[in-house]
């Protein structure tokens, strides 16, 4: 029997910024996002180191501790595709924002709920804001690619409690379905 997912994470892959050159003067980039046994990819944008994908990839989240990996590749016709860098998407702060005891409906549109600064434990290129926008919690982020000389990818995250999903619960409850608690008393 397969466990129900906690929910659905939509990853809107917006664009690449100053991606590495892997062909003679440019690259043909695409993005691959992996989570556990799920692997999704964008279309290839030919001859462009600043591609605009504007694509939405949807992941089913069963365990919030599974890392989400983003890898950019250069499509090659006659040889293997070249890696153009990678990053890990830390979406735990985003999920924690969903747990906050706030009446989100009373917040003004575009209100920042939480800010995450770049640091050694994340791949953020700049501060990222989790906002209440159009009745949803969203997080815009720019990830700095690792293992490459240059390049960033702009994303937006959006959580959905899909049909048949467990959901995230609320911080005030005794136990949330996504983060087990253990009392020591």
From Swiss-Prot:
Gene Ontology molecular function: GTPase activator activity; metal ion binding; phospholipid binding
Inducing or repressing factors: Induced by abscisic acid (ABA).
Disruption phenotype: Reduced sensitivity to abscisic acid (ABA) in single and doule mutant lot1 car9. When associated with disruption in CAR1, CAR4 and CAR5 genes, altered sensitivity to ABA during seedling establishment and root growth regulation.
Main subcellular location: membrane
Pfam families assigned to the protein according to its UniProt record, in alphabetical order: C2 (PF00168)
Key words of the record: Abscisic acid signaling pathway, Calcium, Cell membrane, GTPase activation, Lipid-binding, Membrane, Metal-binding, Nucleus
Domain C2: 1-104
Binding site for Ca(2+) 1: 22-23, 74, 76, 82
One GO term describing the cellular component: nucleus
Gene Ontology BP terms: abscisic acid-activated signaling pathway; positive regulation of abscisic acid-activated signaling pathway; positive regulation of GTPase activity; response to abscisic acid
InterPro entries: C2_dom, C2_domain_sf, CAR1-11
Binding residues for Ca(2+) 2: 23, 28, 74-76
Record carries keyword Cytoplasm: no
CDD domains: C2_ArfGAP (cd04038)
Compartment(s) where it occurs, according to its Swiss-Prot or TrEMBL record: Cell membrane; Nucleus
SUPFAM superfamilies xrefs: C2 domain (Calcium/lipid-binding domain, CaLB)
Cofactor(s) this protein requires: Ca(2+)
Function comment: Stimulates the GTPase/ATPase activities of Obg-like ATPases. Mediates the transient calcium-dependent interaction of PYR/PYL/RCAR abscisic acid (ABA) receptors with the plasma membrane and thus regulates ABA sensitivity.
Quaternary context: Binds to PYR/PYL/RCAR abscisic acid intracellular receptors in an ABA-independent manner, both at the plasma membrane and in the nucleus. Interacts with LOT1 in the nuleus; this interaction is repressed by abscisic acid (ABA) and is sensitive to calcium ion Ca(2+), leading to free CAR9 accumulation at the plasma membrane.
Similarity-based family: Belongs to the plant CAR protein family.
PANTHER family: PROTEIN C2-DOMAIN ABA-RELATED 4 (PTHR45933), PROTEIN C2-DOMAIN ABA-RELATED 9 (PTHR45933:SF12)
Name of this chain's protein: Protein C2-DOMAIN ABA-RELATED 9
Gene: CAR9
